[in-house]
Amino acid sequence: MAFRTADFSRLVRFNSANSCDFLELCESAWDKKIAEDDAKPKSRTIAPSSAYCMKQNWFRLRGVEPDKPKTSDRGLDFTAQVGTSCHENLQSLLKATLKDDWLDVGEFIRTNCTWYSDCEIEQHGLETRIAISNPPIRFACDGLLRWKEEIYLLEIKTSEFSSWDSLTAPKPIHIDQVKSYASLLHVNHVLMIYQDRQYGGLKCFELRISDEEIKATWDTFYYIVDMADKNLPPKGLPSGDSRCSASMCPYHKKCKEW
């Protein structure tokens, strides 16, 4: 039987007491930042990212605590930071290239959205964060642009290479989300850019949201609010749906109790 020599070099993370202490300083600072982010109060609003499940948004509006609190995870935080960097890079490139055809989201809302007087708009770099009071919704817009004589909503998604490489259409879990964004902004056309976080590859898919879909989306928002006011849970996802799991839904356990 042959024995392999262990390669302990892969386990080495520091080479002196000073480097050990400095590594601990870096990791402690990172953990503190993540914990502070996790401790921020959760808003009782509809989240378009959960638009595929009315019941999940019902729990959010009711202020129900998730099944288990979030814990510090440097891996997830790093992935989020990489995703943010990808967004910022693409947004900067597109703004510089499109010039006047890269639209001011705040101005577009003021001109085209009837709920403008009932919202707050914050600019974070080239991302626009929007909070509406009625119905209570918070969302972020990656961009609005004029392309081929149409107004398009831009949505940027990032993923690992293996997931990105197999994409031939928008991921189903993202469609309800972008449909919500488009409906809120009353925009019928969407360009979805998917970027591989490892090598930077890009794919782009177009979606069209009909006026009927926009109306149905708004009706759903108001229905969820009405059910939350009455403390009556709407229907959740059908049995067997892959998104109805403890890993995908923060209210999976509580959902079974309601």
Region locations from a protein language model:
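Short connector loops/turns at beta-strand edges and beta->alpha or beta->beta junctions
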Residues: 63-64, 157-161, 195-199
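Short beta-strand-loop-alpha-helix junction that forms the active-site gateway
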Residues: 156-170
